[in-house]
């Protein structure tokens, strides 16, 4: 069962590993990222950041969608993390039903539009969010930590 979906360019870090894991009683984190899934060093760092009480999957989009749709994680409390909205849009297009996405930290550079203190989006991010919004089935919200109030996210 999917208990949380978050966009966070840092993937698994203290806030996600501790606060969200405890609040949502996560038993498995799934990092969905084509590049990270092929990088042994990044996967090792993610393993070290994952709480001992949780399992970790680091998968490319296609494999993540295949496993979720096959019910592989139905008996677990799954928390999905991705760096970019495009990744989650691809997951949705592959047939994974997501009902809400927590828009967390997205890196800010000179080429991006800043949305608040912790979110920076480029044209690709904006297009992905607009397509997700147009589906009408996914609630987008911002909530940095479980103790913060959730706010609707609109592009």
Regions found by a protein language model. Give the residues of each.
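Long, hydrophobic N-terminal alpha-helical segment
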Residues: 2-55
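Generic hydrophobic/aromatic pocket-lining and core-packing "Φ" positions
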Residues: 17-18, 88, 129
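Ordered, amphipathic secondary-structure segments that act as subunit-interaction surfaces
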Residues: 59-104
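Glycine-rich, aromatic-bearing surface loops/beta-hairpins
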Residues: 85, 93-94, 98-155
């Amino acid at each position: 069962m999917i208990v949380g979906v978050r966009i966070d360019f840092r993937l698994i870090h203290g806030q996600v590993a501790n606060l969200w894991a405890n609040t949502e009683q996560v038993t498995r984190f799934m990092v969905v990222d084509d590049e990270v899934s092929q990088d042994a060093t990044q996967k090792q760092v993610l393993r070290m950041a994952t709480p001992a009480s949780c399992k970790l999957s680091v998968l490319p989009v296609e494999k993540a969608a295949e496993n979720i749709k096959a019910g592989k994680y139905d008996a677990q409390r799954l928390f999905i993390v991705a760096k970019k909205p495009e990744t989650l849009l691809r997951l949705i297009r592959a047939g994974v039903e997501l009902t809400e996405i927590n828009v967390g930290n997205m890196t800010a550079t000179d080429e991006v539009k800043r949305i608040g203190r912790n979110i920076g989006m480029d044209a690709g991010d904006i297009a992905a969010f607009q397509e997700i919004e147009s589906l009408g089935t996914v609630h987008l919200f911002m909530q940095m930590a479980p103790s913060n109030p959730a706010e609707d996210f609109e592009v």
